[in-house]
Structure formats: structure tokens, C-alpha cells
Design a protein with these regions (language model features):
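Bacterial N-terminal signal peptides that target proteins for export
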Residues: 1-11
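Predominantly soluble domains enriched in secretory-pathway, periplasmic, or organellar proteins
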Residues: 19, 24-365
Length: 365
């Protein structure tokens, strides 16, 4: 995703400026939370504090902690208690993506402005190495087969391949165009969302070369990406409020399903067969049930909060985490009206100061 997109930027990129204001006018605050699909409901809200800048949220099964790209650090939250237990930082240029090498007890994030892969100890949270990569680094993912991290510059279409144990760059993969999230398969492949031409790239992680390019024309600006390795299905969430299901073996589009507006993350839970999309414009969590490889059912959405565009999931418990800052319809209307009038982004934030929070949702029991 672009660097620390505010809600307003996310809305404009998703639906266009004119539609954005109209959509906000009917959306309210997004402050009321109600459970629907599979009984998901809000159980806890955790204050994260200043600044109101955030990006990806990724759950570590090894430590049972959620890592959130937040300002100039990673904020670390216990998945069980919901308490903030530490930070990884400082990361002066701001982190975006997060990935883990659990066998080496390492985490990998990025400093986008300084162009660094930042490697840290998963348990002590101490930074152990900073590796020079490309400026504008954004999404980060880890391939368990090659044991390499992939640091994606979404704006230039370049991917740095990093060995986190050695703390070195292996190579750079140049794809070109705008890139978004990436997810590994089980057999040494990496799938990457291509925004510019609506496609998914498959990279062979042994050769670090693109060996397939698959069009997904139904998906305008693919953002989130997750995978069911058992059924060989990729799930790409799109800014035109669609989830596109793609065969990870041959790139065929299996189906498309409706989701909310303003998606920036999606996650798959293999335990339940549920696909989730966090939607910042609508302030909802879309839930889709994978019945089998070819049958998918869109379940009732669950209200979260306007701006809640990134998420994580604890696949052991089914607990879902959504990050959001508080804003109101009136504030966003004023913000967007000023943008329309001046054709520039206002120099003030549409969010209530120090209002960043983590919403924790559990399934029904």
C-alpha cells in the first residue's frame, strides 16, 4: 500500500473522489459494533495511542503476539490479553510490512524512507541487523522453503530478496509497475499482487524469477492476498469491492464475490475455511466461507470502524484484529471538501488525536 495512507487517500484510490464524499455522507462514525457472520463480535478495544499512522498488522503464532506497523516502530500486542507488551524500534522512516522466520526466532520489517530491511529478535524485540534494500520498501513476506524474506517496493515494482539469518541481500527481482501484498505457497512459490495491470505474478523462490503472470481483470487495484494451500486457491481483495478467487496452479479465475469498500488486507483461516477482508471505507469485516475449492458463500459482514483497513488473525483461536483511528462523518466531509476545492491534501488529519486503537473480535462459541 502507499506509504501510511490516511483514510482519505485510501478512499480516493478505492472509489474516486466524488463517490468518496457521497459514500462518507451515509457511513456515520463506524463506532457501533455488531456481530453477524459466524458470530464474530467485538470483545475488546485496545488503545494504541499516537501517532495515528499505521500499516500492516501481522500475527506471530510462535509468540502469540500481534505486530502492528505504527509510526516509527512496531507496536506489539499480546493476542491473549490484548495488552501492549513492547515495541520494535526505533524505525525512523516508518515500518510497513512484517514477516517472521520462526525457526531462526527472527522478525523482518522495513524502513521505507531509509530503504532498509530491519531484522529483529522475535522474543526480545531487539533489532539485530539493518540491511540496505530499496527506498520505498513496503510489504514484506517470508518464504519457508527458501528461508528468504521478500521486501516489496510497491511503487517501483522491485523486490529485494533478503536472507534474514545472514543479514544480506541475495538479489533483486524487478517486475515493474505498482505491486501490493504477496503470499508464499508450500512448494517454493511466491504470489504477488500486481496493481498496474490487474494481475498476479508467480515467482519461483529457488531461481528468484517470475515464471507466470496471470490476469485478474475483475479486480481493480488488488490489495490483500491470502492462500488456501490445500485447495490451491488464492484470494485477492480488490478496491472495487470484490474478492477474486484464483487457482494457484494455473491462474484461472474461479469466481468473484462481493466485499466491503476500502479493503487493504485479507486473511484466510484454514481451520474454519473463512476468508476475511478488512474494509476501511465501509468500516466492516467481510467474511466469506470456502465450502470447497469451487463453492464460496458470502456471509453477513461485521461492523468494525471507519478506517479499519488492515487486519491480522490468530488461526488457533479464530480471533481477528483490526486497526483503526477514530473519525466522524462530519470531519471526513470537511476534509474531502477541502481536498476537492484546493486539489491538494489538507495539512491536518481527519482523525481524533491519539485515537488509534486495536479492535479484537472473537467468533461465536
Amino acid at each position: 500500500m502507499p506509504r501510511y495512507r490516511s483514510l482519505a487517500v485510501a478512499i480516493v484510490s478505492a472509489v474516486g473522489l466524488g463517490w468518496a464524499v457521497a459514500a462518507l455522507a451515509g457511513s456515520g462514525q463506524g463506532g457501533d459494533h455488531a456481530g453477524s457472520g459466524f458470530g464474530y463480535h467485538l470483545v475488546k478495544t485496545v488503545a494504541l495511542g499516537a501517532p495515528n499512522q499505521w500499516d500492516y498488522a501481522v500475527f506471530s503464532p510462535t509468540t502469540r503476539r500481534l505486530f502492528i506497523a505504527h509510526g516509527n516502530r512496531l507496536t506489539v500486542v499480546s493476542a491473549g490479553t490484548g495488552r501492549v507488551v513492547g515495541q520494535v524500534g526505533p524505525i525512523p522512516g516508518g515500518p510497513h510490512g512484517i514477516a517472521f522466520d520462526p525457526a531462526a526466532n527472527l522478525g523482518i520489517t522495513d524502513d521505507g524512507r531509509l530503504g532498509q530491511a530491519v531484522i529483529f529478535n522475535l522474543h526480545t524485540l531487539k533489532i539485530v541487523k539493518r540491511v540496505k534494500v530499496q527506498r520505498g520498501a513496503d510489504a514484506v513476506t517470508f518464504d519457508p522453503v527458501s528461508r528468504h524474506a521478500f521486501v516489496i517496493d510497491g511503487d517501483t515494482g522491485e523486490i529485494a530478496v533478503v536472507d534474514p539469518v545472514r543479514g544480506t541481500v541475495v538479489t533483486f527481482i524487478h517486475i515493474g509497475g505498482d505491486l501490493e501484498y504477496a503470499v508464499p505457497g508450500n512448494n517454493g512459490e511466491l504470489y504477488v499482487n500486481g496493481v498496474t495491470h490487474r494481475e498476479i505474478f508467480r515467482i519461483n523462490t529457488a531461481t528468484n524469477r517470475v515464471d507466470a503472470t496471470w490476469p485478474i481483470p475483475q479486480c481493480r487495484s488488488p490489495h490483500g492476498l491470502s492462500i488456501d494451500t490445500r485447495t490451491h486457491r488464492l484470494f485477492s481483495s480488490c478496491e472495487n469491492a470484490r474478492l477474486v478467487v484464483v487457482d494457484s496452479l494455473n491462474g484461472a479465475v474461479v469466481t468473484t464475490l462481493p466485499i466491503g469498500r476500502g479493503t487493504d488486507s485479507d486473511r484466510f483461516d484454514p481451520k474454519t475455511g473463512l476468508i476475511f477482508s478488512s474494509n476501511g471505507l465501509d468500516g466492516t469485516l467481510s467474511i466469506i466461507h470456502e465450502v470447497d475449492a469451487n463453492e464460496f458463500v458470502a456471509e453477513p459482514a461485521v461492523k468494525t470502524a471507519i478506517s479499519g483497513r488492515t487486519m491480522g488473525i490468530d488461526r488457533q483461536s479464530g480471533r481477528v484484529f483490526v486497526v483503526a483511528a477514530h473519525t466522524t462523518r462530519q470531519t471526513m466531509d470537511r476534509f474531502m471538501a477541502q481536498r476537492q476545492k484546493t486539489h491538494r491534501w489538507p495539512h491536518w488529519s481527519p482523525f481524533t488525536p491519539n485515537s488509534l486503537r486495536l479492535l479484537i473480535l472473537d467468533p461465536g462459541r
